[in-house]
Amino acid sequence: NVADTDRIKSYMTDHDVKRAVIVGGGFIGLEMAENLMHAGAQVAVVEMANQVMAPIDYSMASLVHEHLQQQGVQLYLEQAVDAFSCHDGSLTVHFKSGVSLQADMVLLSIGVRAETRLAQAAGIRLGEMRGIWVDDYLQTSAPDVYAVGDAIEFPHPLTGKPWLNFLAGPANRQARIVADNMVMGNKVKYEGSIGTSIAKVFDLTVASTGLPAKRLKMMDIPYLSATIHSGAHAGYYPGSLQMDIKITFSPTDGKLYGAQIVGYDGVDKRIDQYALAIKQGATVADLTRLEHAYAPPFSSAKDPVAITGYVAGNILSGKMSPLYWRELRDADLTGVTLVDVRTPDEYALGTIDGAVNIPLDDLRERMDEIPTGRPVWLFCGIGLRGYLASNILKDNGYAEVRNLIGGLKTYRAATARIAPPVGFAAAGDSASPTEAASAEKAVVRIDACGIQCPGPI
């Protein structure tokens, strides 16, 4: 809140904060990381899970990890804070792993819990999640008492199971519903929230709605997913930056379960379209029928939302057999032919171990190099050329052909090793941040996501 912001700003000024540790890699933690970096502090983010931004899947969070590191944020993932100590005015953060960090300031952004003590004291019923139980009209077990906001639990529209939703948008909508029901009697029902959220993380925008794959898996709900990397607007119009979108859907009828987007421009309007579609019970086929406003500065003739619908439709219909990054990472490739269908120049810049290079344009002439009696796994930069190659092979009698969903971009991001933090002196470490950084080999990384595939290699 604003009062906390003023206190943090004053503390930084009064105490000349140079190193800040943020415990918790959620929305608030990452927004604070950005602002503290802009204020001139070195920032470390400590997260107990293996990723930041819990509402999104790991493959999408990995894109955020990469961006945070490019901005100079030190990431400590799968690290739990055990204790804090203060000696001679210096604060030390101790991890359960034995690692410790020195800091001038520590911020805790470790989540919230429903405050229900007043309701309990009044004898009002609590639900399974220990939030305040309400009915469809947001009325509690006490007939004259209604409840809204973070403290209530309500069935999720997609699962029917109660959950706590800590978002301002639904809370404001609930307040309007309760006002109507208190004045006019219980006439307006609350339909529930699917958790549509968005955050600014330095230059990136990260958004999600509905159910991610990890939550569907945890709840034993069968699902499929599709991932694309598409320009926010027409590629020939200047300034088109890539956005990465992942959707989850039912493997039987294509019902849309969730969507996640990581990008720079146009993320907000796309996530709102997905949210509306999900709440209306739409299928992936419905995504291809959405009518988008199109002009080159704003979108493409085939909007990224529609493209996710087409890709998901190809998977559902059997036109494309999906290969997901975890399957490829964990696979024994002994009995598989792994083919990189990118150009030789792209292949020379790096590929997946065990892959042979047969460019898409040469595939028909070099098909005899691919054995017919074993599975063929294809990949390209983002998935499109792999899909085209899979159609060519299937048309020529290859039975077991799969295409890597999201292409090499998704695979590389999801399997990338988090760079060891550099520049934060651990307790007892005599090396200065500058010395520690200079000891590392100088590597300049350029984010060229605005360059058209494959780019001017």
Whereabouts are the PLM-identified features?
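Glycine-rich dinucleotide-binding loop and its adjacent helix/turn
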Residues: 1-39, 74, 128, 134-136, ...
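Rossmann-like dinucleotide-binding cores of NAD(P)H-dependent redox enzymes
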Residues: 17-20, 27-84, 166-171, 188-189, ...
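Mid-to-C-terminal Rossmann-like scaffold of FAD/NAD(P)H-dependent oxidoreductases
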Residues: 151-265, 296, 300, 304-330, ...
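A short, polar/charged loop-to-alpha-helix boundary motif
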Residues: 265-284
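Domain-level signature for proteins that mediate thiol-based redox and metal-cofactor handling
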Residues: 432-457
